[in-house]
């Protein structure tokens, strides 16, 4: 007896649906930024205080200890994924910068200028550190910026165009951190930042739920396929 299984086609349909939703979120993010993004002029130097990642560490220090945020975690998500920490030994008298809620984190270098200064925002409350290939900004000026909104703003086309000129190099590109921090850019008003964030997060949460369902569906499909050939 031959078995027919429509699962792969359905799976492809779901993936296409999710990609479409993600594209819509990106487009909406850009549109709202263009519509409301000229209400506050500021800079990261005005918004907070910058700090470096881990220093003075050797390979022997990694693998256990305190959690730290990896380069890939910053690079791959607009909000730090708290399930992807790695670990490093931190001495009781050692001075290392701790990442705080609302901090904006950026990558310092990349092989292409387009990927320099990729950002992410930490929205957790755990004592956590930052890898040495990134830097962070403690946001202190909460009268001008709503940190959760920045997690969307830093992925807009407008912000990516703003950051490109600060990538310097030839074979490998590095972010000119001091110039980047002092450079002015424009944001929506604080109230609009909060409203835009709530709207975008609503869509993002729906996509996240659908991605979870897709993973569960894929596991179920694999189970059923195994049962067919027992």
Identify the residue ranges that each predicted region occupies:
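Extended amphipathic alpha-helical segments enriched in small hydrophobics
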Residues: 1-7, 189-217
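Short amphipathic coiled-coil heptad-repeat segments
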Residues: 5-41, 209-230
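Non-catalytic DNA-recognition/assembly elements of restriction-modification systems
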Residues: 23, 27, 31-55, 182, ...
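Sequence-specific dsDNA recognition surfaces
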Residues: 45-58, 72-104
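A short glycine-rich beta-alpha junction/loop motif
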Residues: 55-58, 127-134, 160, 167-191
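A short beta-sheet element
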Residues: 70-71, 90-155
